[in-house]
Amino acid sequence: MRDQQLDHFLSLSLEQLMEMETTISTDTKQTVSQAPAAVSVITVEDIEATGATNLVDILESVPGIHVRANQFAFRPLIQFRGTNANQTLLMINGTSMRDLMWGFGIFWKGIPSSIIDRVEIIRGPGSALFGADASAGVINVITKTAGKINHNEMGLRSGSFNSNTGWLQYGNSWNGFDIGLTINLATTDGHDPFVAADGQTQQDAALGSMVSLAPDNAQFGWKNQDIRLSVAKDDWQLRVDYMKHSDLKVGLTGAGVLDPLTTAEDSRFNLDLLYNDPDFSNDWGIDAELRYQDLDYTSGDGFQERPPGAFNGDYPQGVINQMQSAERRLSFEASGLFTGVDKHALRLGLGYTWQDLYLVKQLINMGIGPDGNPLPPGSPLVDVSNTPYAFAPEKTRSIRYLFLQDVWSFSDNWQLTAGVRYDDYSDFGDTLNPRLALVWQVSNRFTTKLLYGRAFRPPSFQELFAETSFSRPNPDLDPERSETVELILSYIPSNDLNIAINLYNLQQSDFIRAITSPGESDRRFQNTGNHTIQGIELEAKWQAAKTLRLSANYTIRNPDNNQFRAIDEPKQDAYARVDWNFRPDWNLNMQTNWIGERERRSNDSRSSLDDYTLTDTTLRYTGLNAWEFAFSIRNLFDEDAREYTAPSVTDDLILPERSLYAEIKYKVNSERYE
């Protein structure tokens, strides 16, 4: 079976690409050009063409998004429009990846590309539809599920850093049931960046000791399992997902200290029951979903916050922090789409979510003990679980919400979308978030969009309740808030060229920060400060020939220069990509990502980070019956690229050097399609 996906992808005109349907902006099917938001869609063809092995490999192709590697565990942080990663909502099949403590997960490593069918993205606020955390952007990863897998596939990939991946996808029908199965197993040693000096190096200089493990290499290896089963019949679908990371090395602690001890593990189990009947009655379509999720994180033997011999030998085993947390979430949502009024599509719905941080375990040998007093130097590990001094309390949170949205096509080329969502949280109160979008299709080739949206990020359990040696909680916190106004102009001057510009103004307020108030000695989480980011996003696609497509985007961010600026975000970045089907069955892709103008804080004496340019290329061959082969080079020119770290890691975080990957796939049609 010859794979014609990439050939078909390049044969589509740019007008046809703009007519691609998406649901993320209104929860109803709309074309990208008509969607009342700045919407981007990443297809499975994009993933195959670029050789992306993980979701984070392809996200840099979207204007306004920067994926930054964090020094702790080399964890990818997805940032929209100059904001912090905690302003990003990431979902898989509509289920939020957020947890009560750690954002996407303290050991999150992305999502394997082999399970992805498409990715739908909103650049801008999404709380009017999705609720919490959708302040600056929304990503919904749609996986290969029952009814969507049109061929069975096995694949292997091997490459640099001792990286090996195997995957399987299976789709079939049985007695009227559509069945889908995807399995992805991976292991890697990770790249091992050299760390000349770490956080302990500075302490050694102050104390006259020599216990730092630097200079040495940070270890970032890990293993991954991702197993997903889906069964669908008529209007019903059942999905069961299991994700696990194991043998995960964090490399550097949050304080920038080399940590060779930690071998962490996490797991995530999802069970979803979905009902969708678009023809429930003459004027009504009905959706309902029941979702359950269980998450578990453990640091294994613990984080080695300081190496053996720290503090003039008081800690012969080092400063150790063993942590484990587990939480579960149960949610229900029902909505209806009413089309009984001419030119209106009215969606209304309600939902309830219950979250339970049911397990918190922590053992420490430095800090505040279970009696509220500091532990003595050289203390053995002491259990502070179930005390006010653990990293979080075992607590629950419940959320009730209502939402209403109307899409009004009041003329042939004008459309007004108005929506609002009300969320009521059991721990901090309620919040109301509206949206407005006016779309004017001036002609078949020219579209304008004027958008407004309000969004929020709720305070985390750590900010609300956790008593630590570094900060005190505040149960009276309000959510962080944001308001965005943007103007989008999209123009297709010919069938071969598409140009778009997006201008936005993002205002953030009520930031949650740990600060020391006058008259107090402790740092306490409080709502404080405002911040504005203005930006421009430019993108263009040119079908230079039937077998050649060029695309590019350029982003400028102009944030207020105050303490709330996301210091790790570049003020400028650019992306360029070439797809060339230079012979039948042969496809060559090359993509380049430039990151520029990253400044330090005023109290950071290090020189500004250098700009960097990373270029990747992938060659793919699909002409040998059911077989497919690909070869990729990442960081083709072996650029010395670095990402921002805390000042304790003086030379910042070195990104992976040039790396090579080879891939082989075997595809056969499932019986449903023969």
Residue ranges and their predicted role:
Residues 140, 148-149, 155-157, 169-264, ...:
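Periplasmic-side early beta-strands and strand-to-turn transitions of outer-membrane beta-barrels
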Residues 171-173, 221, 225-227, 232, ...:
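Conserved C-terminal beta-signal and adjacent last beta-strands/turns
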Residues 327-329, 337-357, 367-370, 374-379, ...:
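Structural signature of Gram-negative outer-membrane beta-barrels, strongest in the C-terminal barrel
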